[in-house]
Amino acid sequence: MEKHLIALSVAALLAGAAPASADIKMGSLYPFSGPLALLGDESARGLEIAVEEINAKGGVQGEKIVLVRGDAVDNNQAIGEARRLISVENVAGIFGSFSSGRAVAASQVSELAGLPYFELGAVADEITDRGLENVYRANPYARDFAQMIVEMLQKKIAPKLGRDSKDLKIAVIYEDSSYGTSVAKHEETFLKEAGLNMVLSQSYPGNTVDMSSLVLDLKSAGADVVLQTSYQSDSVLFLQQANEGGYKPSAIVGAGGGYSLQPTADAVGHDVIEAAYDVDFTQFAVNTSFTPGLEEFVEAYKKKYGETPRSGHSLTNYVGAKVILEALNKVKGFDAAAVKQALSAVDIEAGKNAMGYGFKFDQNNQNERASMMGMQWQDGKLVTVYPDAAAISEIRLPQ
């Protein structure tokens, strides 16, 4: 009943509204305030640069793209802001959203209104696994995190440790939102399929303020490898309390989130995060022959924002948005059929853009060519160490 009423109200508002200008409005729906604001804002910056570049070349279908912000501070507000963007601002579609929970909630609203929702950064399976016709995702998703983490553990980390990967005691810890639970589920599956020894799998509230008991559980389990899926605050908290508690596993591997942020390294101390691994979207210390256009993006970012990018989230959103907008420029209109036609025709091989991966949308509207990179914190910087074609450094062992 609620979905029916939402659909009716949105349809009624759209029917009675007329666009104020020939500009094409698009929603920019991210957490701009609240605990996820840093990565939300960083993600939105990539979208903004992409739109500026597209507009400088004539826009899309001859019209200028105008971004209208919506602040998805939590899941309920994501729903409210999606409704506002659609019914009041009359956007032709919505870009977002970094947070999986926000994306799942807000994309349901756009689906009911028959408008496209373009996800550029959130990773939960359910975003594109619900059978929604108008939800598209350009970036890698939870399964890709887990696959790369287990692959790197077997092929790079265990050999560097001088250990057989099957002898390692592995713990999976994760924040309990859609993001954490999706990645952890796949980690458990890939570990089991590889015959690796998982000694602990434990969730925790993303807003927790004390992880000392979890550190004790990891010690008790004898875990010498920890796989953590976390946002920034819980990444910082775990690294700090593990260090304070004298817990030093042979390897800590993050699944993006806080582990990809320079402010995380600065907050915990470069000595504390040294040699921690991170699997995530492409970051900036990478072999640029594998990621053409990356250096130009960094220069555009610095020119616009007066600083270097804070994480690769901006790059991911930038590349995904450009691919989508360039595809939309090849069709007529922004209705569901036109969007489907545009994105179904996308066929980009790996190594042709600043992310390094290719683009082709599958039957679920998921970019099936999206993939992850393996990084490590070395001397206060996050550098790419895997795969070899993208690496700029060998991995190091913690001291």
Curated annotation (Swiss-Prot):
Domain of life of the source: Bacteria
UniProt keyword list: Amino-acid transport, Signal, Transport
Gene3D superfamilies reported in the protein's UniProt record: 3.40.50.2300
Signal sequence coordinates: 1-22
Organism: Brucella melitensis biotype 1 (strain ATCC 23456 / CCUG 17765 / NCTC 10094 / 16M)
UniProt cross-references to InterPro entries, sorted A to Z: BCAA_transport, Leu-bd, Leu_Ile_Val-bd, Peripla_BP_I
Xref: SUPFAM superfamilies: Periplasmic binding protein-like I (SSF53822)
Protein name as catalogued: Leu/Ile/Val-binding protein homolog 7
Keyword Transport set for record: yes
Family: Belongs to the leucine-binding protein family.
